[in-house]
Amino acid sequence: MTIVLNPGKVTLNQLEAIYWNGEVSKLHNDTHLAIRKGADRIAEIAAGSQPVYGINTGFGKLASIKIDANDVAVLQRNLILSHCCAVGAPLAENIVRLMMTLKLISLGRGASGVRLELVHLLESMLAKGVIPVIPEKGSVGASGDLAPLAHMVAVMIGEGEAFFQNIRMSGAAALEKARLFPITLEAKEGLALINGTQTSTALALAGLFQGYRALCGGLLAGALTTDAVMGSTAPFHPDIHILRGHYGQIVVSQTLEKLIKDSEIRAAHLCDDDHRVQDPYCIRCQPQVMGACFDVLVAAAKTLIIEANAVTDNPLILSNGEVVSGGNFHAEPVAFSADQIALALCEIGSISQRRIALMVDPTVSCGLPPFLAQNAGLNSGFMIAEITAAALMSENKQMAHPASVDSTPTSANQEDHVSMACHGARRLLAMNENLFTIIGIETLAAAQGIEYRAPLKTSSLLQSVMKRLRKNIDTLKVDRYLAPDLHKAHILVREGHLLSVLPEIFPRLEPQ
């Protein structure tokens, strides 16, 4: 299925489908007129004698140098080749696809001045699976994501490297195998392509989409744990959350209540609730903590969908034909959003790890055996799995330090304040990988704890989740080589397989 993009109106759901499902995207035909109009205006300026930044001048600190009209194409090519300075491992294909899509959206507004042929090449690369090799490091998130975007454009001009049919090859070879032709850049086109926040925004969106899946997995794991330790659900009563008023807290409490509603374990200790209202905070305060995390993700989503629809290169062509230099390439909004997402990921993992610790400690687990082990002592059960979760939680705490506060001057002090959005967003991927494992460990431990409550059963919804879990991972009856179990649990959480057996009861990630 091809997703047709209407710049300025692209939705979070469309971008999520591109990220998770690899959907191909293209611009709506209605964008073509504005694109042509912008390109004509740039061609008009390039043919004149007036120096205009980015069209017939040097770049950055060299902006005062006028470039001869005959050298404009060379200028644009040199710009791309000289800026291909990113280093590190290649970004994942789904992130590069998302990045290319975001660049299409930006160009589709008609304010960048590129030719329609260039847009069509980018669309064709997406459609035919020519995926530029883009090293992950090298952007400071101001004056755009220059280095990573330059690697994308390098393939468009027959340089650089690309993946085609999962094989890494030269950019020229990839285009040839896809029956596409490299393009010669004209005035401003190179700058329009590499000036922009699309790499940072793609990474932040990936962190957001993964983080939302982790949050839902954390809510599910938290419900399982609540039943495993015979926790009180009185703190999930909707009215107390309505009295506070935070949207995330309200919808999270509703979700937890639905997940546990018809549990036999829950019914068996209802009469004891008067004595159990003081459960540890990791059980009792789930709506407050996870609700706040959800609200943070929603706020970040609001910023990122605006940025996804934005024009962020420089200079820009206004509707009256005026060309104005500004600073839309500065990715501070993206950097702040990435930092906010990092805080939420850190807290989702923190409260999950505390619930794991609760279940393995027989002094507070309401009758569960030490470390959830049968014949404890001979068997260690979840002893070291809990330590693994603690290690990953601590790692995420360190990565949650805000990246946006760490500006440094660059480019001979011309670009003297930068956002650090790119690595601030990229670290979300590592945090989510840790988080999927933490939640996976909690899910395994909670399922084991619930099985100790037999013959009492958990809720019908949680039974369906446990049934899906046990298709992949057996109950831990005696100690065994656990690493494969943790890996499988990680995959189940990351891919949303456990969530897929449930009805749509989780709050939607939609900007309010």
Swiss-Prot record:
The keyword Cytoplasm applies. Its EC number is 4.3.1.3. Keywords: Cytoplasm, Histidine metabolism, Lyase. It is found in: Cytoplasm. GO terms for biological process: L-histidine catabolic process to glutamate and formamide; L-histidine catabolic process to glutamate and formate. InterPro entries: Aromatic_Lyase, Fumarase/histidase_N, HutH, L-Aspartase-like, Phe/His_NH3-lyase_AS. Belongs to the PAL/histidase family. This is Histidine ammonia-lyase. It comes from Bartonella quintana (strain Toulouse).
